[in-house]
């Protein structure tokens, strides 16, 4: 196990998580075959030869043993981007985040200044009738707007039905290409996405093809789902330099009894628990109860912050993407292997032309490389 450098002061400064990335390395489309994306494997030494960069996601099959547990996030990205029209025909874009109360939903708006309280707006689609909405309030935390939808839009199922008629897949702004909407409807979902509720994809899962999943199961690797509906807490830019009291926007998490019992069983063996993506890490770590010192099923909103110094209670390893500078995701991965080492690995990835962000390549952090454990 690597000894952690005592650099707590720097670890709590946002600027310490910055790095330069040539825009040409930002992936605008996914790898044609999911499991053919490139893979950086991080081992238990800072020696360069223990960072493997000549692998592909399909080589994950060689990294896991029979009885290891892979935990995937089965959330499904909703068509959460809506285009609405004001009375003067001005267009405004909404991103539906979550239900506030009754038929009122929190949305990010662009440009938000156009949406004053009590202003009426019209949701339009060439395939369905117009729907009248109203601005019900302003959210101080996000700068978003509380939007009043029709009275029957009171849960995720009814909202998802509406979004399927009027909405678009909410791709990150750095994904710019000419692909049709139908292309992203498939490519920006994991193969196991079954639970609508996310406004961004759990992108590490995009690397797992049906054939790779099948081969992992044939090997005896256990694959179980949790749910974290990826929302504002995952992609919101951090706007404070001092990270010592960082808070994240809450996101809905569900970890069921089957997963918890499997965690308890595996913790008594030499097998490992591998999270597919940072959202799976946050969900799994949230199911550990400090009050009773045990793992418990959960179905609730969580706002867990994982940054350097955090001691992992559940997760042993991680498959993840290459993340944006100064992001909460970069903090989480830094908590696993150390900020300085992670940034050194990013420099290596940039030098070797790895593809970054949502549609980019992957990094696998092996269990023996984690810094902090319970």
From Swiss-Prot:
The keyword S-adenosyl-L-methionine is assigned to this record: yes
Highest taxon above the source species: Bacteria
GO cellular component, one term: cytoplasm
A single BP term in Gene Ontology: tRNA wobble guanine modification
Known catalytic reactions: 7-aminomethyl-7-carbaguanosine(34) in tRNA + S-adenosyl-L-methionine = epoxyqueuosine(34) in tRNA + adenine + L-methionine + 2 H(+)
Cell compartments where the protein resides: Cytoplasm
GO molecular function: S-adenosylmethionine:tRNA ribosyltransferase-isomerase activity
Top EC category: transferase
SUPFAM superfamilies with a match to the protein in the record: QueA-like (SSF111337)
Pathway(s) where this gene product acts: tRNA modification; tRNA-queuosine biosynthesis
UniProt keyword annotations, A-Z: Cytoplasm, Queuosine biosynthesis, S-adenosyl-L-methionine, Transferase
Signal sequence, renumbered to the chain: none
Enzyme Commission number(s): 2.4.99.17
PANTHER family: S-ADENOSYLMETHIONINE:TRNA RIBOSYLTRANSFERASE-ISOMERASE
Family as reported in the entry's similarity comment: Belongs to the QueA family.
The protein's role, per its UniProt record: Transfers and isomerizes the ribose moiety from AdoMet to the 7-aminomethyl group of 7-deazaguanine (preQ1-tRNA) to give epoxyqueuosine (oQ-tRNA).
Quaternary state and interactors: Monomer.
Protein name: S-adenosylmethionine:tRNA ribosyltransferase-isomerase
């Amino acid at each position: 196990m690597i000894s952690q450098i005592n650099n707590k002061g720097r670890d709590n400064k946002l600027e310490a998580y910055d790095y330069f990335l040539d825009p040409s390395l930002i992936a605008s489309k996914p790898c044609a075959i999911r499991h053919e994306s490139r893979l950086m494997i991080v081992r238990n030494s800072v020696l360069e030869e223990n960072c493997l960069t000549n692998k592909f996601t399909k080589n994950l099959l060689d990294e896991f043993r029979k009885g290891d547990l892979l935990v995937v996030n089965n959330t499904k990205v909703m068509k959460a981007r809506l285009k609405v029209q004001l009375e003067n025909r001005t267009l405004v874009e909404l991103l539906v985040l979550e239900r506030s109360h009754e038929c009122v939903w929190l949305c990010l708006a662009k440009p938000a200044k156009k949406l004053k309280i009590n202003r009426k707006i019209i949701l339009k689609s060439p395939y369905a009738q117009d729907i009248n909405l109203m601005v019900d309030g302003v959210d101080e935390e996000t700068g978003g707007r509380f939007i009043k939808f029709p009275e029957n839009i009171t849960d995720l199922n009814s909202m998802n039905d509406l979004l399927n008629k009027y909405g678009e897949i909410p791709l990150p702004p750095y994904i710019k290409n000419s692909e049709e909407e139908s292309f992203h409807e498939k490519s920006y979902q994991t193969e196991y996405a079954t639970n609508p509720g996310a406004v961004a994809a759990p992108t590490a899962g995009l690397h797992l093809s049906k054939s790779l999943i099948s081969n992992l199961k044939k090997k005896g690797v256990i694959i179980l789902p949790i749910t974290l509906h990826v929302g504002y807490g995952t992609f919101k830019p951090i706007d404070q330099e001092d990270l010592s009291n960082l808070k994240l926007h809450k996101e809905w998490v569900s970890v069921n009894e089957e997963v918890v019992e499997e965690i308890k069983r595996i913790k008594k063996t030499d097998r490992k628990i591998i999270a597919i993506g940072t959202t799976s890490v946050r969900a799994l770590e949230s199911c550990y109860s400090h009050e009773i010192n045990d793992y418990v099923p959960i179905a609730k909103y969580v706002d867990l912050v994982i940054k350097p110094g955090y001691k992992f209670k559940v997760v042993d390893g991680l498959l993840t993407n290459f993340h944006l500078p100064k992001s909460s995701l970069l903090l989480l991965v830094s908590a696993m292997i150390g900020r300085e080492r992670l940034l050194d690995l990013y420099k290596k990835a940039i030098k070797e032309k790895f593809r970054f962000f949502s549609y980019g390549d992957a990094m696998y952090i092996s269990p023996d490389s984690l810094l902090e454990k319970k």
